From Swiss-Prot:
Membrane-spanning residues: none
Protein name according to UniProt: UPF0210 protein LEUM_1180
Oligomer status and interactors: Homodimer.
Alphabetical list of NCBIfam families matching this protein: PRK05313.1
Family matches, as Gene3D superfamilies: 3.20.70.20
SUPFAM superfamilies documented for this protein: PFL-like glycyl radical enzymes
Organism this protein belongs to: Leuconostoc mesenteroides subsp. mesenteroides (strain ATCC 8293 / DSM 20343 / BCRC 11652 / CCM 1803 / JCM 6124 / NCDO 523 / NBRC 100496 / NCIMB 8023 / NCTC 12954 / NRRL B-1118 / 37Y)
Length: 447
């Protein structure tokens, strides 16, 4: 590397909030299945703690040696519903607690994979897991969950969407924050290192390391140097910056995998904000030329940003995967919080933005009296965007009891704060209650 490039990397870390957002170890649990849930839970605990015992130590070594912060160390596992074919909802809690205990034993921040894949229908394990979610997510601290309810190839499972709306509502009655640990996907990916949607897909190797980079602050600082330039210069600047960010992620991931004696999976290029000022995707969009995120032009600016990040990243790593785009979680992004508070950023605009970025309606507070069918309808709209456009979309929505539109809700830490946003009050219940399955789009038939 040239001296100038080395100095740029140092500045990115010290001044522009560049970090490795997560080093996530993916672990297959297919070989832990035993005759009864309690024994399977013991096997899960043993495998996770065996492989992940040095994850924290190795990540901290790399941090010290290279001066690059690694914010989170996490684990993802095989979707638990796949290994729980005969389980009841009560049985599922053995698995949830085994995951939670294992995560605490090795010291990671979160463990993902308390998940089900129901885009085409339910198996017994899927239903048991979904029915267990209100207890599983409120009785554990570090367990993250996801449910995939649609795909471009399979279509959309409207029965699952109805059930997930009821589940989100049920969770909100037990906890204000537990829904932050649940993502409802369309077109979920198998190698996502980010929470809460991470799980270890069945086509993955036994144990892998996946890395999620971040750097909204780095991109914003780079764009500050090209004020007034053409939009082509903006795109080129983002591409070059994403290249540098991804190189750092590639190096950290390869080192971590080598030292842990496991395979290196992918680098996820996603720009993931935090509530800290200067670490905001909204501020990047505003630097491109918007007075405030949510105004007209926001979707176009986000499309440009997302595309340029991907183009720069794929040149820097042969192993790009995960979600790889820009995240727009309202409560976790200082600029999004401001725009939502002022009414510039609405649910409708966020839905439009999800058509061109990762991932969806994310970390959005809505009134606690929002009906289950309205929540289901929001999930259905997001799924439709993902399924029709062959991309990942998701919903992580937070109905908060006792709140009304305009109230501020503090979720703490990286989860941030969010204003309660209005939802349309007209009912979608008759649509959701039809149930059944929305067929796959015509362009999914490619064989």
């Amino acid at each position: 590397m040239e001296t100038k490039q080395i100095q740029e990397t140092i500045n990115m870390v010290e001044e522009e909030h560049l970090d490795i957002r997560t080093v996530t170890m993916g672990i297959s649990l297919l070989d832990t299945i035993a005759g009864d849930p309690q024994q399977t839970a013991k096997n899960i605990y043993k495998k996770v703690t065996t492989y992940a015992k040095d994850l924290i130590k190795v990540a901290e070594q790399i941090e010290r040696e290279y001066g690059i912060p690694i914010t989170n160390k996490r684990i993802s596992v095989t979707p638990i519903a796949l290994i729980a074919g005969h389980a009841t909802p009560d049985d599922m809690l053995y698995y949830a607690h085994a995951l939670d205990d294992a995560a605490k034993a090795v010291g990671v921040d979160f463990i993902g994979g308390y998940s089900a894949l129901v885009q085409k229908g339910f198996a017994n394990g899927d239903l048991a897991l979904i029915k267990s979610l209100p207890r599983a997510l409120t009785e554990t601290d570090l367990v993250m969950s996801s449910v995939n309810i649609g795909s471009t190839k399979a279509g959309i499972n409207l029965d699952a969407i109805k059930l997930m709306g009821e589940t989100v509502k049920g969770i909100s009655e037990k906890s204000d924050t537990a829904n932050a640990k649940l993502v409802i996907f369309a077109n979920a990916v198998e190698d996502n290192p980010f929470m809460a949607g991470a799980f270890h897909g069945v086509s993955e190797a036994d144990v892998v390391i996946n890395v999620g980079v971040s750097g909204p602050g780095v991109v914003k600082r780079a764009l500050e140097k090209v004020k007034g330039e053409s939009i082509q210069v903006v795109a080129e600047t983002v591409k070059k910056t994403a290249f540098k960010i991804t190189r750092v992620g590639q190096m950290v991931g390869a080192l971590a995998a080598e030292r842990l004696g496991v395979e290196f999976g992918i680098v996820d290029l996603s720009l993931a904000p935090t509530p800290a000022r200067g670490d905001s995707v909204a501020e990047v969009l505003e630097e491109i030329g918007l007075e405030q995120v949510g105004t007209h032009g926001t979707t176009a600016a986000l499309m440009l940003l997302n595309d340029a990040v991907k183009k720069g990243g794929v040149m820097a790593s042969q192993r790009v995967g995960g979600l790889s785009g820009a995240f727009i979680p309202v409560s976790e992004d200082a600029g999004m919080i401001d725009a939502a508070k002022e009414g510039t950023l609405t649910l409708s605009k966020l839905e439009a933005m999800t058509a061109v970025c990762s991932v969806g309606l994310d970390m959005i507070a809505i009134p606690g009296d929002t009906s289950a069918t309205t929540i289901s309808a929001m999930i259905a709209d997001e799924a439709a965007i993902g399924v029709q456009n062959n991309k990942t979309t998701a919903v992580r929505i937070l109905p908060t009891l006792g709140t009304k539109v305009g109230d501020m809700v503090d979720y703490g830490g990286l989860l941030g704060t969010a204003p309660v946003m209005p939802v349309v009050e007209k009912s979608s219940a008759d649509f959701i209650n039809r149930g059944g399955h929305i067929p796959a789009p015509i362009h999914s038939f490619k064989n």
